[in-house]
């Protein structure tokens, strides 16, 4: 009975095995059908690697340990092989490039500064009516005009007045116009008898306010009624009356005398077009319009390599090259009339003599071939060279067709364009898969870190002349650095430009296909030979493709204005060799060249970015110099560099490492200050006292006493703890106190009941509450100096009590005179005098500034089929 049971179990197991075998056969048949359908179908789909875990059957678990180990190894090997095959065969679509539209928009939005039309003059000051207070603190009906600051804002917290001047200088640099055309900003003077005009709307509003002021003299009113422009048409000059503070007048007069506009004519526009575009016979350029004599333009600032961002600024350089890459991809033309993917795969199948697409080495040759991948590869190669972005290669060693396509890639693209590790891996795969087996040589065992590449080693060991000759060319394939129109260009080898190098490649491939592959099976030799045959059948198309690649690269390169420095980038652009196979196999005979509009757009974006880059460098250098002279060098330096990077628009400042920030600071420090920016700073420096006096938040010093001092009556404020002069006080300079750190002198004087005056610009706060005055007694104001010894945090309180204050009548009713232990030393602001503030400004009567010079050029191209390369032969000869 036991025997029968054992036999029954064996029969059941046999039946079970038969069923499993049938299922496996059906599964394999269906897999074959699915594979052939997927490879030959027009539909393109992304298929990722299979992640199914191989399930071990219960029978295998129950078997002996040795059998289970063997079975596990077999299944594991099968799984790995299946994954590798699926990766190649089922991968129908190459992941395409997704443009970062935000970066592209940032680049394209950088416009020349002249686009900001000046509608007003530059002003720091404006006249304000201030009340007058009687001796008892009551406000009078009369007012008085003073020059006050237009933007009198000091941030809260510890804030040095010197930082205010640095920010003011930054504001002046931001608003400093490249040109001023007074005619464009002039407005009507409402009080004029003959509809005259004044220079800008602010002058008109000041005149209006003064005219309506009851205390204005009749002579001044009559003068305002006579204010109008004076035109000298024969000299193309116009004079406009303006109301300006003397310092503001100095600024605007300087801007008028140092305008950046230059006369514009057809010759300038002609020379503005890149020379290689002008001389390219494929582009027909016309300029129909004659410019008026009043045409003007601002010459772009295209100085080269002032900061050398390619040298030791890895993060910054990576960002710049990435932006340039995205921009370049947007202008590289799309390929047209590519060979039908389905037709080409069928033809390749016939060439390979494949009766059915079974899982064997030749079937991998057809993987990943589609027009999208071909176009993507074409754009990637050209954009990477234009932006000098480093590329990395992605490939599978068992796909011989990918490696043979890679041989074309390494022939036409200089070695420097690939990251070293990727280049070595690809070359090693080509050597060990194709070259060495052909001659029966042992596999190359390459040591990581070897200064020589696998191709260098192979060149020395290969005896065949044609193969060694091709290896020699690839090993020495580097960009030639040529300066054209003052710009460093990375130029391709002439043999690549004219396509002759492809013949050299084909000679080497033919030699390899004729070899016996003595150490390899016949199938291996046949696979390599058929792969070479597929590529050699497209010799003419490959020559054309190489010429097309070189022509588009060099034509777009003519529009680059910054030196093309070649340094390996931190990140790389991935290029799959299957997409290179797509490009080689699907390239048709349709020529594509950039349209003139695309070229002009690319050129304008490059010019605008480069010019803005240099202008922002000038600003940063000027502010660093100003910070140094204002003793703010340590305090503000990193913020200045961060602002500089923000104004270039393309950088994510928070992600830039500190070491690169400080290296950038050191480079900026070495550059000279531009003369206009230096003159403007000197103007501010010479008039710091006037600016301080006009502010309601900056004092010229503080008086500290041990005993309380009475608040005194002031015509501008009422009862106030202000000192208008320092007569009779011992004076100590705040700057010297900070430098020396010797506070004993102040302490001794205060203990001896002698008031001391600390002289220097410092911010103060205003309080008009009597209650707070009683509560504070101002002891905290100088405690910081005596105890904490921080002069830069000193911020005295100015107590202002008058009929506008909340607690004024409390003081008036009790006839109480408040006291304070500190007095703010504040000089009287400059009084407004109409006669001294009236200035005549002179500018051209009219001129027109043109920002887009290429708008005057009408451009067209020859028929693409007739387009010729540098050797005066058609780019695409294979028709």
UniProtKB/Swiss-Prot annotation:
The record marks 219, 223, 227, 838, 840 as: Interaction with the intermediate capsid protein VP6. It holds the Pfam family Rota_VP2. Residues 393-413, 421-441 are annotated as: Hydrophobic. Residues 9-30, 39-52 have a biased composition (Basic and acidic residues). The keyword Protease does not apply. Residues 1-52 are annotated as: Disordered. It is found in: Virion. Residues 1-79 are annotated as: 5-fold hub. GO terms for molecular function: RNA binding. The keyword rRNA-binding does not apply. Signal peptide: none annotated. Sumoylated with SUMO1 and SUMO2. Sumoylation of viral proteins seems to have a positive role on viral replication. One of its GO terms (cellular component) is T=2 icosahedral viral capsid. Keywords: Capsid protein, Inner capsid protein, Repeat, RNA-binding, T=2 icosahedral capsid protein, Ubl conjugation, Virion. InterPro entries: Rotavirus_VP2 (IPR007779). The N-terminus binds RNA. It is necessary for encapsidation of VP1 and VP3. The N-termini of 10 VP2 molecules form a cylindrical hub underneath each 5-fold axis of the inner capsid. HAMAP family: Rota_VP2, Rota_VP2_A. Belongs to the rotavirus VP2 family. Homodecamer; each decamer is made up of two conformers of VP2, called VP2A and VP2B. Interacts with a VP1-VP3 complex. Interacts with the intermediate capsid protein VP6. Interacts with NSP5. Interacts (via N-terminus) with NSP2. Inner capsid protein that self-assembles to form an icosahedral capsid with a T=2 symmetry, which consists of 120 copies of VP2, with channels at each of its five-fold vertices. This capsid constitutes the innermost concentric layer of the viral mature particle. It encapsidates the polymerase VP1, the capping enzyme VP3 and the genomic dsRNA, thereby defining the core. This is Inner capsid protein VP2. It comes from Rotavirus A (strain RVA/Human/Philippines/L26/1987/G12P1B[4]) (RV-A). The lineage of its organism: Viruses, Riboviria, Orthornavirae, Duplornaviricota, Resentoviricetes.
């Amino acid at each position: 009975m036991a025997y029968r049971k054992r036999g029954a179990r064996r029969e059941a197991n046999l039946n079970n095995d038969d069923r499993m075998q049938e299922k496996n056969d059906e599964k394999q048949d269906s897999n074959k059908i699915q594979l052939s359908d997927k490879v030959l179908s027009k539909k393109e789909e992304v298929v990722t690697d299979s992640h199914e875990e191989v399930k071990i059957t219960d029978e295998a678990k129950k078997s002996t340990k040795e059998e289970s180990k063997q079975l596990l190894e077999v299944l594991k090997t099968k799984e790995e092989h299946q994954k590798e095959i699926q990766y190649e065969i089922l991968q129908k679509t190459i992941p395409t490039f997704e443009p970062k539209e935000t970066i592209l928009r940032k680049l394209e939005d950088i416009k020349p500064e002249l686009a900001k039309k000046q509608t007003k003059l530059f002003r720091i000051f404006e006249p304000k009516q201030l009340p007058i207070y009687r001796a008892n603190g009551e406000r009078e009906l009369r007012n008085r005009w003073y020059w006050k600051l237009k933007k009198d804002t000091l941030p809260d917290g510890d804030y040095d007045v010197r930082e205010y001047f640095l920010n003011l200088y930054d504001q002046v640099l931001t608003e400093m116009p490249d040109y001023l055309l007074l005619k464009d900003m002039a407005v009507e003077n409402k009080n004029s008898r003959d509809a005259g005009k004044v220079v800008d709307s602010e002058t008109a509003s000041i005149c209006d306010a003064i005219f309506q002021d009851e205390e204005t003299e009749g002579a001044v009113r009559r003068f305002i009624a006579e204010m109008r422009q004076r035109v000298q048409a024969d000299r193309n000059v116009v004079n406009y009356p303006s109301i300006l503070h003397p310092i503001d007048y100095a600024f605007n007069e300087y801007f008028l005398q140092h305008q950046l506009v230059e006369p514009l004519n057809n010759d300038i526009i002609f020379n503005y077009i890149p020379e290689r575009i002008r001389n390219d016979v494929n582009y027909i350029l016309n300029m129909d319009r004659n410019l008026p004599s009043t045409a003007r333009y601002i010459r772009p600032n295209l100085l080269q390599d002032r900061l050398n961002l390619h040298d030791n600024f890895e993060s910054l350089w990576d960002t710049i090259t990435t932006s340039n890459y995205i921009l370049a991809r947007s202008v590289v033309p799309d390929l047209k009339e590519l060979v039908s993917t389905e037709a080409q795969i069928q033809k390749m199948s016939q060439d390979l003599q494949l009766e059915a697409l079974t899982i064997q080495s030749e079937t991998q040759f057809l993987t990943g071939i589609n027009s999208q991948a071909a176009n993507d590869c074409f754009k990637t190669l050209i954009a990477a060279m234009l932006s000098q972005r480093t590329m990395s290669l992605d490939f599978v060693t068992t796909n011989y067709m990918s490696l043979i396509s890679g041989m074309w890639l390494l022939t036409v693209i200089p070695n420097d364009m690939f990251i070293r590790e990727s280049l070595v891996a690809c070359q090693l795969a080509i050597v060990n898969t194709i070259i060495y087996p052909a001659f029966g040589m042992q596999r190359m065992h390459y040591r990581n870190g070897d200064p020589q590449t696998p191709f260098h080693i192979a060149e020395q060991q290969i005896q065949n002349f044609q193969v060694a000759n091709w290896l020699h060319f690839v090993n020495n394939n580097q960009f030639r650095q040529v300066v054209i129109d003052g710009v460093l260009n990375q130029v391709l080898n002439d043999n690549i430009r004219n396509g002759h190098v492809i013949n050299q490649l084909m000679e080497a491939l033919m030699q390899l296909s004729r070899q016996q592959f003595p150490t390899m099976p016949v199938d291996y030799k046949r696979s390599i030979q058929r792969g070479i045959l597929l590529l050699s059948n497209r010799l003419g198309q490959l020559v054309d493709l190489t010429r097309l690649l070189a022509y588009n690269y060099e034509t777009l390169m003519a529009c680059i204005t910054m030196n093309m420095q070649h340094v390996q980038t931190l990140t790389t652009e991935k290029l799959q060799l299957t997409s290179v196979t797509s490009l080689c196999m699907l390239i048709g005979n349709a020529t594509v060249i950039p349209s003139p509009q695309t070229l002009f757009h690319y050129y304008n974006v490059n010019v605008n970015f480069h010019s803005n880059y240099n202008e922002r460098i000038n600003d940063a250098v000027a502010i660093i110099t100003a910070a140094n002279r204002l003793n703010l060098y340590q305090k503000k330096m990193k913020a200045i560099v961060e602002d500089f990077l923000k104004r270039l628009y393309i950088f994510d400042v928070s992600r830039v490492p500190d070491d690169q920030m400080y290296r950038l600071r050191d480079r900026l420090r070495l550059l000279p200050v531009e003369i206009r920016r230096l003159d403007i700073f000197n103007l501010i420096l010479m008039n710091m006292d006037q600016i301080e006096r006009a502010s309601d938040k900056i004092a010229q010093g503080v008086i500290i006493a041990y005993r309380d001092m009475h608040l005194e009556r002031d015509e501008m404020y009422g009862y106030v703890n202000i000192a208008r002069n320092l007569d009779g006080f011992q004076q100590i300079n705040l700057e010297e106190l900070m430098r020396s750190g010797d506070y004993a002198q102040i302490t001794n004087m205060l203990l001896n009941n002698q008031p001391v005056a600390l002289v220097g610009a410092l911010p103060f706060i205003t309080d008009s509450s009597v209650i707070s005055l009683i509560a504070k007694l101002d002891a905290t104001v100088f405690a910081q100096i005596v105890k904490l010894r921080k002069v830069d945090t000193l911020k005295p309180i100015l107590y202002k009590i008058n009929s506008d204050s909340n607690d004024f009548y409390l003081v008036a009713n009790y006839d109480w005179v408040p006291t304070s232990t500190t007095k703010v030393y504040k000089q009287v602001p400059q009084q407004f005098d109409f006669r001294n503030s009236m200035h005549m400004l002179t500018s051209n009567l009219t001129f027109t500034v043109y920002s887009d010079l290429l708008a005057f050029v009408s451009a067209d191209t020859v028929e693409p089929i007739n387009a010729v390369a540098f050797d005066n032969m058609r780019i695409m000869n294979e028709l």
